[in-house]
């Protein structure tokens, strides 16, 4: 009997841990690649295609919920938004859809809670903030409604007209409750502040609202700057709202109401127009505020006039009370006869002829140092604001005149 010879067996391939890991990495990479590949499809493909591609994706569920809500299928939208939130609890858009479905179903208190949460989570969720604006306005809660409106208008200039109209209508119809809220928003100096203030420029109601806001802001942390106040003053003046203009200046005291002539010494250019000197330049007329070459560090108004051109040299608005007043100023002549070629005039801002016209210096004066001249005039009862002007008295021949003015003032005659 022959001995059996053991034949060696076929060696088994041993799978080590490294090979298993590499297989796992490959599988993971395939899955990850698939997820990356379908992301654009889930975001941009038609909802019907996206839901077949990734039915469990929170993104797709949320898109489907939005689509159902837009189509008016409220129950489907509510169910899909809840499914999306179950998979992605912080999906603001899904939360907003759920809130809007509650509102469509008549459960506005529940909708208010949900959409408030959505609005707090994201300042960019415009539909949530828009719904909250409307809801809070119906409840008379201006503070909350305007806060959400502020959130909207900070981001989107295209809706400024609608939001501004909201502020304006509320301020016109319910000023006692809404104006302090609007003023509080403006006091934070939002990026839309200038645009809103500029929009209040057409109707008498808008102008009255602008005046009221100026007074409210003056007592707060962010009063109108000189540019904003100057814009308001000019708008009121051009719209013939003289009483409102006088009221605003008196209430906010800018420039100080006690000074009949603002910057009469020509040293303070900070006051807003039209209660500030406005100088005019044209051929034959040069007016500038420069340092006096006789009195060191003293600015004054220097006028170089050819005696032939006609026009206004300088002007500012005043609000003198009715009665008798005295005009005084200092003058220094370099050349010519300013009394014959220039005059200080006062006229009503609402129209009409000059109330007074005073020669701009002593008659037949010779070049010399500074001297004072004065004149008296009356302001009637129906003239709440006046233009103080330095004007030319042109003649048919040129007569060069160079003259300085300083310390221009108006005081009660008595």
Region annotations inferred by a language model:
Residues 9, 13-44, 158, 183-414:
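Extracellular and organelle-lumenal recognition/adhesion modules and their flexible linkers in secreted
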Residues 46-51, 76-82, 109-117, 143-152, ...:
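Alpha-helical repeat scaffolds
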Residues 53, 87, 121, 155-156, ...:
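Structural marker of alpha-solenoid helical repeat scaffolds
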